[in-house]
Amino acid sequence: MFKVNKDSAYNFKFPGAKVSIEKNSFYTDKMIQIFEENNLLHVDKDSIPLLKGITIKMDISRYNDSIRNRTYIGRIGENKKSSFVSSKKEENYVIAKVNNLGDFVIKIDSIKPNVSVIDISDNQWISNRKNLSIKISDNESGVKNYRGTI
């Protein structure tokens, strides 16, 4: 347990993760439990409200380049399922600013997005069409951006 004064900034370092808490991130002074164990970063409970987000950095140096490009931070929910946390990569870290405390892990996006054409049937001629409708979905990490070319 660590005492976190709301008027102070903190940096916690673990073998595979770092946590940065800015000044005034909490509404009041708190005792929080924070640790890393078996590749899981535990930052207390989701029930503690935050005034500002905190930054978590998780080390991905143990992965080779082809896997490192597909890593993201997953937040473990009450149902033990992980949900995607928006993040960016810098050097050997995946970095996210989170607005909720909880448990975080490195996940690897192993499922390709699904791209399907809407309102066109097989062997249908499309050269006279002005618009094409396409549905893009991804059940794992989501689709951040896309580009279509014909």
What do these predicted regions represent?
Residues 28-76, 125:
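Proteolytic processing hotspots in large secreted/extracellular or virion-associated proteins
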Residues 10, 110-116:
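Proline-centered linker/hinge motifs at extracellular inter-domain junctions
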Residues 66-69, 137-150:
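Solvent-exposed loop/turn segments flanking beta-strands in beta-repeat/beta-sandwich domains
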Residues 20-22, 55-61, 131-139:
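Short edge beta-strand/loop segments characteristic of extracellular beta-sandwich folds
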Residues 117-123:
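Short, solvent-exposed loop/edge segments of extracellular or virion-exposed proteins
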Residues 4-29:
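Predominantly extracellular/luminal regions of secreted and cell-surface proteins
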